[in-house]
């Protein structure tokens, strides 16, 4: 969630997806 779409998605997937 640093502002970059890739990072946002990675953080989101890392929290819920994992």
UniProtKB/Swiss-Prot annotation:
InterPro entries tied to this protein: Lectin_legB_Mn/Ca_BS
Keywords: Allergen, Glycoprotein, Hydrolase, Protease, Serine protease
PTM note: Glycosylated.
Gene Ontology BP terms: proteolysis
Keyword Flavoprotein set for record: no
EC number: 3.4.21.-
GO molecular function: serine-type peptidase activity
Function: Has a serine protease activity.
Name this polypeptide is given: Major allergen Epi p 1
Origin species: Epicoccum nigrum (Soil fungus)
């Amino acid at each position: 969630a640093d502002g970059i779409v890739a990072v946002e998605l990675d953080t989101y997937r890392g929290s819920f997806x994992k």
